[in-house]
C-alpha cells in the first residue's frame, strides 16, 4: 500500500470515527524519553549492565529487546532487569514476548506488525497491562487504536541502522498526520538523536525512542541525563 492510498483510507476512517464514542486514553508516558536496552553494537555490555547504566541516568521507561537468545536464557535476564527497574521506579516493557512480560510481571509488551497480534497479546496479558504497537503508516496507526493499543510506536522517523524495518524514513510531516488521526500516545522511533528529539516532540510525538545515541555513548548514564534535560526543554 502506497502512502497516498494509506492516507486516503486513514482519512475516511477518521471521518467515520467522529460519530463514534471513544473512551479517553488512560495511559501517559512517564517520561518523554523511551529507552531501549539492546546490546547489539556493545558486545562488552550485558543486558543487566546496560539496564543499570540507563536507569542510573534517571530513565523512567525502558523496553528490553532481546532477539537472539532462546527463552530459557531470556527469562532469567528479564527477571533481573525487572528487579533493577523496580528498584529505580522505571516502567518495563518487553519487546515482542508477551509470555516473558507475563512471567516477570513487566508493565507491558511492545509488538510489531510481524509479531504476536495486538488482540492475542492482550489476551495473554489481560486488561491491566500495557500493549504498545509499532506502526509505519496512517492505516496501521488507526488499526492499532481500534484494537485498543495503549500507545503507538511510529517510524522509522529518520533513517536508522539499528533495526531493519523494511520501511523508508517517514519524516516529520507524516508524524504530524498520524498525530492528527489517533488519540493514544505516540512514541517516535528510528534515527532519533539528542539533536533531533525536540523536532520529533514538536511534530506531535509524546515520547522519543532512542537506541544508538544512548547505547553507543561512551558514558551511557551521562547520555541518558543529557537527553532527559533536552526533552524536558522541548
Residue ranges and their predicted role:
Residues 205-213:
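Short, electropositive alpha-helical surface patch
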Residues 7-9:
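Leucine-biased recognition of intrinsically disordered, low-complexity hydrophobic segments
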Residues 171, 188-193:
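Glycine-rich adenosine-cofactor-binding loop
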